């Protein structure tokens, strides 16, 4: 027997039993972003490597450790996309979508990072992202957060997520703060863990994000970024907080929240949860007003967020909030007796014409009545339609309810269509 080939570690199959939950999540995401005026954009999963180096930053963990990078046959360095914002900006610049325009775009699809696989974190993962270009006030930051808040309400997880906010100010303000932070950390260099020592000079703000308890204790006395912010940056942040408060959205200010990508400025936010064990981030985003220019476009204000869909699905399953998922099959058509197969397939197509949303499975592969009913029950259908020789002769169909106590009945095909239509409303 040939050796079995398995999926790559950290890259998972989504099986038919799992797909309905994903489809429900995707449906809600699409409905909500459409209600806010966003349009879908689809980008390739492979990009030139230097796109991510320029956008994310060469000294970030993503670029240094996590990207899947390879040379193609022409010797060009290509990478599987580790996130969606850089690709979305590249597409907007390339196709002239951003200059002097307000653009609202969203995307959904697989991303790739070579991380250690663990619960809710995979090497191929799916991300839902929303990006807005052309508006630079705190009002659009607030609206994006309101959009995510609406999603949590629709998914039923509002009580299980917490909004954390921070502001990173402008690049010049961060530069002054970086100098002060490095000067402070140098006093404790020997006490820092290896990762923080490495980051101290290459990307010192990331030290604030360290999970090491000793490092966190050292940071208690560190300079505050807020003390280095100018009036405009502080006013932007205060404006955002006022809008969130007026909308009834609770938040926590987390001055250690810096995000792992270099392109952010001003507003950054994360929605975090404790429902998956250790605190995990479900959704994160912020402003990146300099990224479009950094990638070759005209100066364009921008803000966006992304959420990990695996984590969202895992939350719904963990909290048992996926019980209203529609089964894959609504109705199972059983055909019993001589000459019923041809009539059965004609009936099935008639039902699909009349009821396009009906999920109808026709029995195939032969078998007696008992076997067909067993398959009908296993399919998850609520109703079995039974077409026997008598039903074919009389132009009727027998309706058997597989879930609940309703009595079996034999009706005309038109009556069956009306009954199924009423149940689907």
Swiss-Prot record:
E.C. numbers: 6.1.1.21
PROSITE patterns: AA_TRNA_LIGASE_II (PS50862)
Reactions accelerated catalytically: tRNA(His) + L-histidine + ATP = L-histidyl-tRNA(His) + AMP + diphosphate + H(+)
Family according to the record: Belongs to the class-II aminoacyl-tRNA synthetase family.
Keywords, comma-separated and alphabetical: Aminoacyl-tRNA synthetase, ATP-binding, Cytoplasm, Ligase, Nucleotide-binding, Protein biosynthesis
Keyword Nucleotide-binding applies: yes
GO BP term (any one): histidyl-tRNA aminoacylation
Subcellular location field: Cytoplasm
Enzyme class: ligase
Primary gene name: hisS
Subunit structure: Homodimer.
Name of the protein this chain belongs to: Histidine--tRNA ligase
Chief place of localization: cytoplasm
Species annotation: Aeromonas hydrophila subsp. hydrophila (strain ATCC 7966 / DSM 30187 / BCRC 13018 / CCUG 14551 / JCM 1027 / KCTC 2358 / NCIMB 9240 / NCTC 8049)
InterPro entries: aa-tRNA-synth_II (IPR006195), aa-tRNA-synth_II/BPL/LPL (IPR045864), Anticodon-bd (IPR004154), Anticodon-bd_dom_sf (IPR036621), His-tRNA-ligase (IPR015807), HisRS-like_core (IPR041715), HisRS/HisZ (IPR004516), HisRS_anticodon (IPR033656)
Any single GO CC term annotated in Swiss-Prot or TrEMBL for this entry: cytoplasm
GO terms of molecular function: ATP binding; histidine-tRNA ligase activity
